[in-house]
Amino acid sequence: MSSLNKSPFLKIFLSYLPVIMLFFSVFNEFDFNYLKLDYFSFNFVHLLIFFWTLRNPDQLGYLAIFFAGIINDVVIGVPIGISSFCYLILCSVTAYIRNITLSPNFMKDWISLLLTILLINSIQVIILDLVFLIKVDYTNYLINTGFTFLFYPIFFLFFNFLNERISYQIND
């Protein structure tokens, strides 16, 4: 088993796993529509980008995030560039938080996630509704923001475990 832990394939796979998860989630439009749950949705991509650009920005590059936004726009059918713009705003906020934070704190990160997602969704709604005149359901955005905020602790634990494994494999 120890030979598997020292495998070069495993090191490479783990180092690219956040990027793989990002592109997998934007290609699939990760949601729960197939469960026929009307008022349940969360934005996995926002959680992924927020965590990795805040805790380990070397694992998820800004160019990959930009292209993931372009792909997301094509998949969901909104004008190209809106998701990329919102994802890069998310990256900017996390870079700012990372630079002003002396010691990482889960609760502060969680609250800043809520404020950041509210900002991003507000910008996206304004662009879609006022600029492109696309009908937007405000309730869905509010529900999505709430569930994304509530699911952050679960995904934080998963991403933190993954981050430790990646750091262990790279430093080994």
Question: Residue locations for each model-derived region?
Answer:
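Terminal, non-globular segments
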Residues: M1-D172
